[in-house]
Amino acid sequence: DLITNSYTRGKPRHVTSWRNLKTRDVCDSLVEGRCIHNGCQCDRSAPHGNCCDTDGCTSLWWCPKTKWD
């Protein structure tokens, strides 16, 4: 029960945090199609999967380097 309750309690916080980060995702053509997610710069041609699509960043972003702006 303790494990289940802890997992259930932690889940809403994780979802809320993800949505907050998601709103700051941007797929910027000005940086060669790179996707910037919460200070993390992502390449569309990354081997780990696409970073950008028409809706912005996907959950499969890969970060070769960080960018703080």
Curated annotation (Swiss-Prot):
Q: Report a single Gene Ontology molecular function.
A: toxin activity
Q: How is it modified after translation?
A: Contains 4 disulfide bonds.
Residue ranges annotated as propeptide in the record: 1-23
Coiled coil segments of this chain = none
Keyword field contains Coiled coil: no
Q: Does Calcium count among this protein's keywords?
A: no
* Chief subcellular location: secreted
Which tissues express it?
Expressed by the venom duct.
Tell me where it resides: Secreted
The lineage's top-level taxon is Eukaryota
UniProt keywords (A-Z) are: Disulfide bond, Neurotoxin, Secreted, Toxin
Gene Ontology annotations for the cellular component aspect, listed alphabetically = extracellular region
Record's comment describing the protein's domains: The cysteine framework is XII (C-C-C-C-CC-C-C).
Q: Please identify the protein, giving its name as recorded.
A: Conotoxin Cal12.1p4
